[in-house]
Amino acid sequence: MLKPGDPGGSAFLKVDPAYLQHWQQLFPHGGAGPLKGSGAAGLLSAPQPLQPPPPPPPPERAEPPPDSLRPRPASLSSASSTPASSSTSASSASSCAAAAAAAALAGLSALPVSQLPVFAPLAAAAVAAEPLPPKELCLGATSGPGPVKCGGGGGGGGEGRGAPRFRCSAEELDYYLYGQQRMEIIPLNQHTSDPNNRCDMCADNRNGECPMHGPLHSLRRLVGTSSAAAAAPPPELPEWLRDLPREVCLCTSTVPGLAYGICAAQRIQQGTWIGPFQGVLLPPEKVQAGAVRNTQHLWEIYDQDGTLQHFIDGGEPSKSSWMRYIRCARHCGEQNLTVVQYRSNIFYRACIDIPRGTELLVWYNDSYTSFFGIPLQCIAQDENLNVPSTVMEAMCRQDALQPFNKSSKLAPTTQQRSVVFPQTPCSRNFSLLDKSGPIESGFNQINVKNQRVLASPTSTSQLHSEFSDWHLWKCGQCFKTFTQRILLQMHVCTQNPDRPYQCGHCSQSFSQPSELRNHVVTHSSDRPFKCGYCGRAFAGATTLNNHIRTHTGEKPFKCERCERSFTQATQLSRHQRMPNECKPITESPESIEVD
């Protein structure tokens, strides 16, 4: 054992400088420090375990007693000890604990706690002497090497006294650590307390699905709901097209003559409402006076009595929304949206389930017109009338027809006024009729270059309406209508004298019939007319009609001489050219008179 004051004794000690510095911080009032004297030498030479450091002594004690610095195993291990010796031993154990913490910081190893049966109860008593508030944790930070203090007790060195301390309850700590794992996912279909659970088609409040019009999706407004996950639009798109919802996307329209269209980016369920349609409100007087030239994006707003209130014009893109690019359907076969007026707004409602990638095409339905008591009838233009010069003049000259019936003739009806509706050259030839007088309008003539003739329908299935047997083919220049496409191809339009021969498939026109015939060959691969009996497809409506007669047995072409009937006109002409085949009924051997 080293003797106190031995000059060579320090050569045998390997003490970390950080360890000495820590002891100097614990005992700043000890002159040269606790290492002077026999107490320090005995403490360093004895293989005593290291324990965390205790709190600093009170200010009135300038220097701790020398006996309290030296652990005495004999006195500590004795079972009978006085209260004074117990308190002294507790402070000694705390000093050893402080030395252990400093040694851990300096890189020195300490003995395990299980090998210290004597110091364990004393350390537990020291910890129990400073209880913490229940269910609270203290988080402290210090900038110096002193120990981190928790609670309201006195700090260690000068650096430890000014350190910030944070408190949080055990419930808060448990919520931030494990609260996300206990989150409960609530399905959306459990929310049944919506006050607007209403079917607007039949104007009835319901608690569930409407049995007539399907699920209730009237609150699913797609306008203005932008998608952050959607792909960035091309930079050349205007601002009003960059805020598309995630359910739709911009596409090339299938309607001839129109550039853009809106298609479904995902499956849109039947009954989904899209809207409201945004635009500029126009009084009826302004529209009827001819101030609006483009009526393609014009919708009407009626009151409960069926009186026209105003128009909503979406022709100006900066004051409208992306809904203006939802095009009008040309026939019922391609229609998937219907126009619905709810209060003073226009909405589009999905009448069928729209698959992904299908273009959205809108038009009226029967419930829209029956709600206001406005009859929806098929109209056709009388070919004997003069050629109209404007769109409104052509619409006003049309006569209302009764639903077409093969077994009866068309009944004459009175001429009625047609209200302005969104019209495109390829839109379906329907109009809403009103009982008031005719409208005088000054609409300018539509540019012929932007017109496209209504070519063959995209679907050959018959329309599921009372007008399924009445197909109209309309000239894009003079608006004359024909029942067959071949008649439209043979039609010579007077609006363009230089190029009167117009193709029935596209908008091209030619000056000579031979040029038109050569051009029609390019459309020969298109066979939109399909037979419902055998499934064969044909390029023209006349060819299909001739083929259908082979299934039905109808022979409308009858020879006047021999009264034989044929299914096609070519068969009749060939029969009449044959001299030995066509024999009149009156020419018989019994009826021949001989002079």
Curated annotation (Swiss-Prot):
Record-level GO BP terms: methylation; negative regulation of smooth muscle cell differentiation; negative regulation of transcription by RNA polymerase II; neurogenesis; regulation of gene expression
Protein origin, superkingdom: Eukaryota
Substitution effect: residue 263 to S: In PDA3; uncertain significance
Any one cellular-component term (Gene Ontology): nucleus
Domain SET positions: 246-365
Compositional bias annotation for Low complexity: 71-90
Gene3D superfamilies according to UniProt: Classic Zinc Finger, SET domain
Class in the EC hierarchy, top level: transferase
SMART domains recorded: SET, ZnF_C2H2
GO MF term list: histone H4K20 monomethyltransferase activity; identical protein binding; zinc ion binding
Compartment(s) of residence: Nucleus
Catalytic activity: L-lysyl(20)-[histone H4] + S-adenosyl-L-methionine = N(6)-methyl-L-lysyl(20)-[histone H4] + S-adenosyl-L-homocysteine + H(+)
Disease: Patent ductus arteriosus 3: A congenital heart defect characterized by the persistent opening of fetal ductus arteriosus that fails to close after birth. Fetal ductus arteriosus connects the pulmonary artery to the descending aorta, allowing unoxygenated blood to bypass the lung and flow to the placenta. Normally, the ductus occludes shortly after birth.
UniProt-recorded name of the protein: Putative histone-lysine N-methyltransferase PRDM6
Species: Homo sapiens (Human)
